[in-house]
């Protein structure tokens, strides 16, 4: 049941960044992790992908105008 949520058409793709990817993204955004929007460890998608506190998650949404919209979230309790 965990993985079924990831296949739903309204749930965008979520990817946990590794440490080097997270550092690169934070540098590009000129931001600290705490400045990112948050996602809870209890969020159903965070649970399904195995996100832990402190992880940065890349969310890729389909957009009719931009084709893709990418955002990042910091996982917190």
From Swiss-Prot:
Keyword field contains Nucleotidyltransferase: yes
Top-level taxon in the UniProt lineage: Archaea
Molecular-function GO term, any one: DNA binding
Keywords assigned: Cytoplasm, DNA-directed RNA polymerase, Nucleotidyltransferase, Transcription, Transferase
GO cellular component: cytoplasm; DNA-directed RNA polymerase complex
One Pfam family from the record: RNA_pol_Rpb5_C
Tagged with keyword Transit peptide: no
InterPro entries the UniProt entry points to: Arch_Rpo5/euc_Rpb5 (IPR014381), RNA_pol_subH/Rpb5_C (IPR000783), RNA_pol_subH/Rpb5_CS (IPR020608), RPB5-like_sf (IPR035913)
Main location: cytoplasm
Subunit field text: Part of the RNA polymerase complex.
Function per UniProt: DNA-dependent RNA polymerase (RNAP) catalyzes the transcription of DNA into RNA using the four ribonucleoside triphosphates as substrates.
Protein's name according to its UniProt entry: DNA-directed RNA polymerase subunit Rpo5
Taxonomic source organism: Methanothermobacter thermautotrophicus (strain ATCC 29096 / DSM 1053 / JCM 10044 / NBRC 100330 / Delta H)
Gene (name only): rpo5
């Amino acid at each position: 049941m965990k993985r079924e949520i990831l296949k739903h058409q309204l749930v965008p793709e979520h990817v946990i960044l590794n440490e080097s990817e997270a550092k690169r993204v934070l540098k590009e955004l000129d931001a600290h992790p705490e400045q990112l929007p948050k996602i809870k460890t209890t969020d159903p998608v965070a649970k399904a992908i195995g996100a832990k506190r402190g992880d940065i998650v890349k969310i890729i949404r389909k957009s009719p105008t931009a084709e893709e919209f990418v955002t990042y979230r910091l996982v917190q309790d």
